[in-house]
């Protein structure tokens, strides 16, 4: 009798697990290269390039997971990652040269411009760069 009950429990557990299928990604895909104009509260105005790549295997429903890379001439590369919920996304980034503590987190709002291109406006905070720092970026997909 115990064997039968254990077997029934095992089958029921397996069916329950199968019912929890991860939903397919249905959110917007922001993959691409973006040209950016930024304003850093310590460094001033700058131009950069952001590359986003969807990680579909880690995305589901309206939630998107991305590789993130910001490149700023004269400063370097800031690899990181981005998590999106619909048109709102959070990013973490860190300068490859970690000696300056130039890393932070940003929050962005995505939209399409009049030409139908994805664009985003980002606010970022860097807790350790030069005693703390913040700034803005406006980026348009090329």
Question: Residue ranges of each PLM-predicted region?
Answer:
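Central antiparallel beta-sheet cores of small beta-barrel/beta-sandwich binding domains
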Residues: 19-142
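Positively charged n-region of N-terminal signal peptides that target proteins for export
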Residues: 1-4
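N-terminal signal peptide c-region/cleavage motif recognized by signal peptidases
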Residues: 13-16
């Amino acid at each position: 009798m115990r064997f039968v009950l254990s077997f029934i429990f095992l089958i029921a557990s397996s069916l329950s697990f199968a019912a929890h299928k991860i939903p397919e990604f249905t959110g917007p895909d922001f993959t691409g290269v973006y040209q950016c104009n930024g304003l850093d509260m310590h460094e001033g105005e700058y131009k950069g390039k952001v590359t986003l790549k969807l990680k579909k295997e880690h995305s589901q429903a309206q939630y998107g997971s991305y590789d993130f890379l910001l490149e700023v001439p004269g400063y370097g590369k800031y690899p990181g990652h981005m998590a999106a919920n619909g048109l709102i996304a959070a990013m973490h980034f860190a300068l490859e040269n970690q000696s300056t503590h130039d890393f932070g987190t940003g929050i962005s709002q995505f939209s399409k411009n009049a030409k139908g291109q994805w664009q985003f406006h980002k606010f970022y905070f860097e807790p350790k760069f030069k005693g703390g720092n913040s700034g803005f970026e406006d980026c348009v997909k090329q």
